[in-house]
């Protein structure tokens, strides 16, 4: 990919001499000893085979002042593209959604993230698909979708529960929660796909699943779909297959209808607050 030295250059042990591309990954080749570059046997764009020489370096004591140590790197610097990703993720956090949090406070209910964070041990939750948005780009501007449909209304991932009492492997759980502040916690195309993936992981790893199921069921307003019906959605089949695989716990506060109620009803244990309304049909 690139050469960082030329014949006659003094190099110190550990200096990156060249960068090679293999299997779509870039690999640094560093000097194993200090010395002088005598000649180089490759050029950018060449195909390199196993055991082929790349360059010849004659070992020598090298004056530190004569060695180009390269550009100093600030290890605390965050690249602009990474900063953009972090800012994008942060849009879905409660502290950046004050209006949504206020709506939950008004009904004396908790947010989806509060429930997940309080259930899992601190620092153990690995969220899947936090930057997913609703499949509505044909009807809604992208910026609005990013602001109003974080995670497409489904927070899900793997975390540990009661890790202080059990070994790490035994404490590991799949934790999922519909987010009622996002389109009434309805089931959209992207959060269905997220569920499909997480259910398959739970089956493979035999993970207990805790699912906060508040929400209004199927969402009719998604536009970015390729099928006329939802017969291609395997989520409910995958969810049913988890029965007997590991414990399934459903929790609900508030309204839980249609597809959300199916998720809840298939659980081994259901925990519902007194203000819950659960049914296969009804208002979202």
State what each model feature region is.
Residues 159-179, 194-221:
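A structural preference for short, pocket-lining loop segments at secondary-structure junctions
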Residues 65-173, 177-184:
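Intrinsically disordered, low-complexity segments enriched in small/flexible residues
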Residues 1-2, 16-34, 239-240:
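Short beta-strand-turn/beta-hairpin segments enriched in glycine/proline and small hydrophobics
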Residues 23-30, 58-68:
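Short, Lys/Arg- and Gly-enriched loop/turn segments at beta-strand edges
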Residues 213-284:
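Conserved catalytic cores of soluble enzyme domains
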Residues 1-10, 39-43:
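Short histidine-centered loop motifs in beta-beta connectors
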Residues 176-202, 207, 268-270, 276-280, ...:
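Extended active-site and interfacial segments that coordinate phosphate-rich ligands
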Residues 8-22, 45-57:
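A structural signal for short beta-strand/turn segments enriched in small hydrophobics and glycine
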């Amino acid at each position: 990919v690139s050469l960082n030295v030329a014949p006659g250059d003094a190099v110190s042990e550990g200096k990156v001499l060249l960068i090679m591309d293999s299997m779509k990954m870039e690999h640094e080749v560093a000097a194993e000893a200090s010395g002088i570059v005598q000649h180089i046997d490759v050029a950018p764009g060449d195909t390199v085979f196993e055991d082929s020489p790349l360059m010849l370096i004659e070992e020598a004591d090298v004056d530190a002042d004569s060695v180009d140590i390269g550009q100093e790197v600030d290890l605390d610097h965050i690249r602009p593209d990474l900063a953009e990703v972090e800012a994008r993720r942060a849009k879905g956090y409660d502290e950046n959604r004050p209006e949504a949090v206020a709506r939950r406070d008004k009904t004396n209910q908790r947010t989806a993230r509060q429930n997940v964070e309080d259930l899992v041990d601190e620092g153990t939750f690995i969220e899947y698909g936090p930057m997913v948005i609703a499949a509505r780009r044909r009807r809604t501007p992208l910026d609005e979708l990013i602001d109003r449909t974080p995670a497409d209304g489904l927070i899900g991932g793997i975390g540990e529960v009661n890790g202080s009492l059990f070994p790490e492997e035994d404490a590991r759980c799949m934790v999922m929660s519909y987010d009622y502040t996002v389109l009434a916690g309805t089931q959209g195309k992207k959060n269905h796909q997220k569920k499909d993936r997480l259910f398959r992981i739970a089956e493979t790893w035999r993970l207990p699943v805790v699912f906060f199921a508040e929400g209004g069921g199927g969402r009719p307003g998604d536009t970015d779909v390729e099928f006329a019906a939802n017969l291609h959605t395997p989520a409910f089949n995958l969810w049913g297959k988890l029965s007997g695989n590991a414990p399934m716990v459903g929790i609900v506060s508030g309204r839980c209808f249609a597809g959300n109620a199916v998720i809840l009803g298939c659980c081994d244990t259901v925990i519902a607050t007194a203000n819950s309304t659960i049914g296969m049909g009804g208002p979202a």
